[in-house]
């Protein structure tokens, strides 16, 4: 059976029914008691792979829960689905395309066929092209129109052409190469362009225009603005090729813009935008951290690919995380998932994972077009650790929703200040511990009495200090963020998303919902500027158009 042609209805499997019954058995399950009853629980539910240490012991599971979840994966023929992706089958059924971002991190000598053609020589040709360009820039050989070396590289792109590269560039800032600064321009808001341009010198700035079609509205508008700025600063049309390169499958449009053919890096239909940081879309990453570190990033992702393909499901990090996500979404009613990195350099990981997860699994029909019979992708949210503790962690602890969380933390800091990192690590662990333990009414009352409060005051305050606990979380620990470990971490989440899509029977690699807003946006714009007088499809939109037109002044 081809999953992408005849998706499975997992809700009809015996293992799904067994999990539903098992969920009722766990109605009164308490993690706090489970740790007391089983001194080996942490050892049983934690292990290392690819430079990552996963502790999943603070979950609403027993060993038989894990066994049932693994049985679900086996009955859903997850192994076949994994093999189909890596073999280049057209698992993106709606667009009839293979999904081969994994090919971008495979070593020389491997063979991957697309329509009978081995794509690996082309993958490594482009990687070599990237290596040469990065070397020219870092060695001061790529020069602007006044013969000054490039000092600033600006990536113009949005979505997958922005979120992944920005995450990696920021996460690996300790590896940044001296002499070249990297910036990102994504939003069509003119204020973003203005603030960035104020910090740049046109003589020493190189723009990378990243757009598969070379027609993405936000990217093209920003590229045109950058072009106009360059010319206004004294640049010439004849020398424009020194300041603009492109990553696009539309070579003709890039050349028409003024970019030389040899400076147009290709994109392939078998790599989706949110999975593209491993391709030439990752040029700003390589510009920032150097090509050798970029290759380390690829190597770490490749290690995770191997782990995903070969590790038994019960010791397979992306498979386990995917199964736990289904467990909470479909059997416990969880509708969101928090990503909580306790590392300043990982502050953008939540943004990337929002696109990766929600654009992939935010679907309501299966691969064959029939409605889903289960839940699908959760809302992904969160942010950098300690800041969240003073903001939304309150909801995690005492809110009415069950919200699973992933804590991500390094053992060592690149920038140790006194005992700051020990406190950071302690905060991470204590938050996951507090979510699990909670605080009972008896404990709250005892705490208040110990402070000498009158009994009436104890009874008044105690209900507010009760914390339910039993809130699930995973903790991912790395020794220190490196290119290799970061590659493994990002690939881990990519594969987790795919695992869940298989169990839900959906296509994780299209995004038709995104297209509707783009289509309607053209009509709204035409009405805003007065080139279309026909009213909008609804009174609300038309009213807001009229409000804008009545007040807008340039």
From Swiss-Prot:
GO terms for biological process: gluconeogenesis; glucose 6-phosphate metabolic process; glycolytic process. Pathway: Carbohydrate biosynthesis; gluconeogenesis; Carbohydrate degradation; glycolysis; D-glyceraldehyde 3-phosphate and glycerone phosphate from D-glucose: step 2/4. GO terms for molecular function: carbohydrate derivative binding; glucose-6-phosphate isomerase activity; monosaccharide binding. Its EC number is 5.3.1.9. The active site is at 359 (proton donor), 390, 518. Catalyzes the reversible isomerization of glucose-6-phosphate to fructose-6-phosphate. This is Glucose-6-phosphate isomerase. The lineage of its organism: Bacteria, Pseudomonadati, Pseudomonadota, Gammaproteobacteria, Pseudomonadales. The gene is pgi.
């Amino acid at each position: 059976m081809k999953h992408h042609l005849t998706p499975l209805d997992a809700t009809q499997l015996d293992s799904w029914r067994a999990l539903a019954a098992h969920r009722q058995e766990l109605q009164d399950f308490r993690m706090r008691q489970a740790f007391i009853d089983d001194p080996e629980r942490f050892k049983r539910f934690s292990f290392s792979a690819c430079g990552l240490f996963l502790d999943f012991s603070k979950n609403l599971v027993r060993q038989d829960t894990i066994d049932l979840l693994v049985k679900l994966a086996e009955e859903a023929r997850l192994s076949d689905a994994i093999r189909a992706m890596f073999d280049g089958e057209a698992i993106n059924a709606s667009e009839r395309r293979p999904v081969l971002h994994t090919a971008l991190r495979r070593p020389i000598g491997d063979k991957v066929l697309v329509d009978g053609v081995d794509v690996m020589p082309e993958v490594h040709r482009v990687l070599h092209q990237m290596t040469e360009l990065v070397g020219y820039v870092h060695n001061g050989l790529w020069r602007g129109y006044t013969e000054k070396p490039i000092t600033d590289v600006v990536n113009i792109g949005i979505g997958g052409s922005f979120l992944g590269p920005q995450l990696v560039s920021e996460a690996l800032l300790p590896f940044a190469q001296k002499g070249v600064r990297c910036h990102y321009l994504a939003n069509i808001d003119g204020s973003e362009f203005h603030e960035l341009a104020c910090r740049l010198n046109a003589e020493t700035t190189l723009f990378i225009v990243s757009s598969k079609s070379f027609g993405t509205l936000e990217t093209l508008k920003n590229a045109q603005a950058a072009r106009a700025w360059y010319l206004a600063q004294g640049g010439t049309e004849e020398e424009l090729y020194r300041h603009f390169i492109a990553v696009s499958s539309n070579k003709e449009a890039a050349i028409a813009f003024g970019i030389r053919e040899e400076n147009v890096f290709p994109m392939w239909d078998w790599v989706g935008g949110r999975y593209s940081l491993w391709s030439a879309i990752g040029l700003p990453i390589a510009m920032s951290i150097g090509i050798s570190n970029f290759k380390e990033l690829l190597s770490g992702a490749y290690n995770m690919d191997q782990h995903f393909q070969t590790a038994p499901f019960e010791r397979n990090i992306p498979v386990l995380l995917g199964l736990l996500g289904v467990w909470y979404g479909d059997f416990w009613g969880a509708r969101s998932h928090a990503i909580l990195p306790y590392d300043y350099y990982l502050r953008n990981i939540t943004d990337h994972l929002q696109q990766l997860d929600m654009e992939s699994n935010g679907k309501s029909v299966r691969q064959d077009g029939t409605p889903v019979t289960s839940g699908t992708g959760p809302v992904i949210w969160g942010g950098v650790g300690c800041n969240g503790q003073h903001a939304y962690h309150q909801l995690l602890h005492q809110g009415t929703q069950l919200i699973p969380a992933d804590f991500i933390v390094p053992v060592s800091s690149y920038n140790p200040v006194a005992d700051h990192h020990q406190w950071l690590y302690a905060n991470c662990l204590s938050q996951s511990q507090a979510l699990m333990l909670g605080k009972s009414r008896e404990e709250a009352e005892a705490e208040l009495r110990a402070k000498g409060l009158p009994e009436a005051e104890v009874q008044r305050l105690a209900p507010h200090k009760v914390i339910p606990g039993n809130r699930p979380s995973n903790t991912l620990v790395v020794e220190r963020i490196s290119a290799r470990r970061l590659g493994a971490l990002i690939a881990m989440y990519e594969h987790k998303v795919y695992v869940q899509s298989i169990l839900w029977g959906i296509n994780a690699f299209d995004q038709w919902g995104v297209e509707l807003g783009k289509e309607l946006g053209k009509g709204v714009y035409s009405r805003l500027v007065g080139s279309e007088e026909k009213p909008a499809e609804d009174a609300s939109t038309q009213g807001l158009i009229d409000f804008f037109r009545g007040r807008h002044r340039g």
